[in-house]
């Protein structure tokens, strides 16, 4: 199977996001790369599902909370930018302050 560099990067992000998802499910606090991959994967999959840019920008802020990540990670992740593939093309999604202080219910 031949993959372009962009396809390889997307596959790597997906794999890292799935690993982070498994760790979060086990109650392991996510580090910086895991948190970034988790949120990035959420945005990429949401785009493929047909969600809009504005919807993903807002939803991306509530995927993880401070209780899901290691100390210091929220301060390091002040924004995430993802070039996601939507049904009508590739668009840039920017999520500011992606790790919320609120506790998910």
From Swiss-Prot:
It comes from the Bacteria. One of its GO terms (biological process) is urea catabolic process. It catalyses: urea + 2 H2O + H(+) = hydrogencarbonate + 2 NH4(+). It is an enzyme of class 3 (hydrolase). InterPro entries: Urease_gamma, Urease_gamma/gamma-beta_su, Urease_gamma_sf, Urease_subunit. Pathway: Nitrogen metabolism; urea degradation; CO(2) and NH(3) from urea (urease route): step 1/1. GO terms for cellular component: cytoplasm. Its EC number is 3.5.1.5. Pfam families: Urease_gamma. This is Urease subunit gamma. It comes from Bacillus subtilis (strain 168). The gene is ureA.
């Amino acid at each position: 199977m031949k993959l372009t560099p962009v396809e390889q990067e997307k596959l790597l992000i997906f794999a890292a996001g799935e690993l982070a998802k498994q760790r979060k499910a086990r109650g392991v606090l996510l580090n910086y790369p895991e948190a970034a991959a988790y949120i990035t994967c959420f945005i990429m999959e949401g785009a493929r599902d047909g969600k809009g840019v504005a919807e993903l920008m807002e939803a991306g802020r509530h995927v993880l909370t401070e209780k899901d990540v290691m100390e210091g990670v929220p301060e390091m992740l002040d924004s995430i930018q993802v070039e996601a593939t939507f049904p009508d093309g590739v668009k840039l999604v920017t999520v500011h302050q992606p790790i919320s202080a609120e506790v998910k219910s």
